[in-house]
Swiss-Prot record:
Keyword Nucleotide-binding (UniProt): yes
Entries under Pfam families matching the protein: PapZ_C (PF22740), RapZ-like_N (PF03668)
Residues bound to ATP: 12-19
InterPro entries (alphabetical): P-loop_NTPase, RapZ-like, RapZ-like_N, RapZ_C
Residues annotated to bind GTP: 62-65
Domain of life of the source: Bacteria
Keyword vocabulary terms for this entry: ATP-binding, GTP-binding, Nucleotide-binding
Protein family per UniProt: Belongs to the RapZ-like family.
Protein name, per record: Nucleotide-binding protein PEPE_0450
């Protein structure tokens, strides 16, 4: 391996936030594996070395088996003598009361008390994991944390300027006659704007055509709407970022997805790209299905 390998073992109490932690490491560019069977560890390690391009690995594991923990650290300790490796153990914890409350909320059984009280399972697990917690380089108490705060804590420990994920915006135009995008976070209906479809010379063109674009954007209704809508989006983007969202899809819809939505999406993507990483796509712009009615 040419560059230093960062290997993070994420473990801790059940219900303390290992799933959120794994998602956070994924956003930081780590190659993540959740609950790998111990028998596969040596083979996994060989594949990492052979690949040569993976520099960050996060292994999220259930370490109630002390033997697995010893196996992981034994393997890494031996490899550290031959390769440039940095190893960290992150232990996620919370108070017994908080863990019990989380299990009660999800109505799940504790893995160490499948037929008994959750509190008994938490107590048993804490006893088993106590030695591992004492050896962890990083212990995070998630008792009073929201998922966003846990994510922020992990970023604080492991992010660099190169690994902080950028906020990506996807602007997509669509036609309501084909259904709205299922992955849209924000949908704006622009069917209230004058429709170029009814202008003979514009009917068979799409919103990327300068003539159609100018027709849509130069309407008085468009100017007033667009100014307010862009300001609204710029005002709320920081909130999405603070909540830990790294990707946002904004969908702009009109009837057929060929004229108004395309033009507005083009302008919006251009303006948003001045501050954010922005991509644009026109889902239905080239669909030419005949329709009797167009509103």
């Amino acid at each position: 391996m040419n560059e230093r390998l960062q290997f993070v073992v994420v473990t801790g109490m059940s219900g303390a936030g290992k799933t959120v932690a794994m998602q956070s490491f994924e956003d930081l560019g780590f190659f993540c594996v959740d609950n790998m069977p111990p028998a596969l560890l040596p083979k996994f390690w060989e594949l990492i070395k052979e690949n040569g391009k993976i520099s960050k690995v996060a292994l999220v594991v259930d370490l109630r088996s002390r033997g697995f923990y010893d196996q992981i650290l034994g393997l890494l300790t031996g490899e550290e003598e031959q390769h440039n490796i940095k190893t960290d153990v992150v232990f996620l914890d919370a108070t017994d009361e908080e863990l019990v409350a989380r299990y009660k909320e999800t109505r799940r059984a504790h893995p160490l008390a499948m037929d008994g009280r959750v509190a008994d399972g938490v107590r048993k697990e804490r006893e088993l994991l106590s030695p591992i917690k004492s050896e962890a380089q990083i212990v995070i108490d998630t008792t009073n944390m929201t998922p966003r705060e846990l994510r922020s804590d992990i970023f604080g420990h492991f992010s660099t300027n190169k690994t902080i994920p950028k906020f990506h915006i996807e602007v997509v135009s669509f036609g309501y006659k084909y259904g709205s995008p299922i992955d849209a976070d924000i949908i704006m209906d622009v069917r209230f704007l004058p429709n170029p479809y009814y202008v003979t010379e514009l009917k068979n063109k799409i919103g990327t055509d300068p003539a159609v674009y100018d027709y849509v954007m130069n309407q008085p209704a468009t100017e007033e709407f667009y100014t307010d809508y862009l300001k609204l989006l710029m005002d709320i983007m920081p909130g999405y970022q603070k909540e830990g969202k790294s990707n946002l899809t904004i969908a702009i819809g009109c009837t057929g997805g060929q004229h108004r939505s395309v033009a507005i999406a083009e302008r919006l993507a251009k303006d948003l790209s001045k501050k954010y990483v922005t991509n644009i796509s026109h889902r239905d712009a080239h669909k030419r299905k005949e329709t009797v009615n167009r509103s």
